[in-house]
């Protein structure tokens, strides 16, 4: 991998990680459109450490409170009803599905799931799902001619059942094209949560899974002779810087705007990919990067 490739891919990772458009799909597509090797699942996982570092800094106050309260709840039973302590436990609960499925489906994630036809299908299907969830939330928030606006749930209403459903939505994002934020936020909207609440839990929930995946892949990469460490680490730093700017913008965006621009973008991109693969312009199976 060249330094220019790492710069571009780092920017792509940072720009798309927190948007409901699938960062793994865009890394895969950027390489395919540019004629580069597929950067692979390991590169994606390692550079995601950079974007999750942006989450840690952006939500540092929330995370600090959650960790402190959760730690105290281990020895003080009265703390187990504290909202921050509960959030810590619910992040753990929500991380179980992706932990189990990530280890079980590791070979598929690194191989068959990276087929561009699957990526395109997921972009379209999940795009439609996000659109339905967005319209449902907008209808509740605005009400209608014969119905009053509906009060949507806050994170204080989050329980084990909802946490597990969020976790299953996150696990679906193991398939390129789904989008971690798109799947979890739309899942939250379907369960009746406010947009900001759904997004906040989505980003907090991603921290253990992404960091664990990144460390796991980092361990394997350190034992490999086929990793371009300089460019990979450079891409991770670029992803961190870009990701921080995007997450700050996105949290403001979702409070007042619809997800429909992302929905139409996903559907259009999915259709373009299917057409280009069908006419032979793009190969559905790109070669893995050799370094």
From Swiss-Prot:
GO MF terms, alphabetically ordered = undecaprenyl-diphosphatase activity
Coiled-coil parts of chain: none
Q: Which reaction does it catalyse?
A: di-trans,octa-cis-undecaprenyl diphosphate + H2O = di-trans,octa-cis-undecaprenyl phosphate + phosphate + H(+)
EC number(s) on record? 3.6.1.27
Supply the alphabetized keyword list: Antibiotic resistance, Cell membrane, Cell shape, Cell wall biogenesis/degradation, Hydrolase, Membrane, Peptidoglycan synthesis, Transmembrane, Transmembrane helix
Q: Which domain of life is it from?
A: Bacteria
* GO cellular component annotations of the record: plasma membrane
At the top of the EC hierarchy, this enzyme's class is hydrolase
Looking up InterPro entries in the UniProt record yields: UppP
Protein localization: Cell membrane
- A Pfam family for this UniProt protein? BacA
Please report the record's description of how this protein sits within the membrane.
Multi-pass membrane protein
Q: Where are the transmembrane segments?
A: 39-59, 85-105, 118-138, 198-218, 231-251, 262-282
Provide the GO biological process annotations: cell wall organization; peptidoglycan biosynthetic process; peptidoglycan metabolic process; regulation of cell shape; response to antibiotic
**What family is reported?**
Belongs to the UppP family.
Q: What else is known?
A: Bacitracin is thought to be involved in the inhibition of peptidoglycan synthesis by sequestering undecaprenyl diphosphate, thereby reducing the pool of lipid carrier available.
- Summary of the function given for this chain in its UniProt record: Catalyzes the dephosphorylation of undecaprenyl diphosphate (UPP). Confers resistance to bacitracin.
Q: State what protein this is by name.
A: Undecaprenyl-diphosphatase 2
* Native source species: Streptomyces coelicolor (strain ATCC BAA-471 / A3(2) / M145)
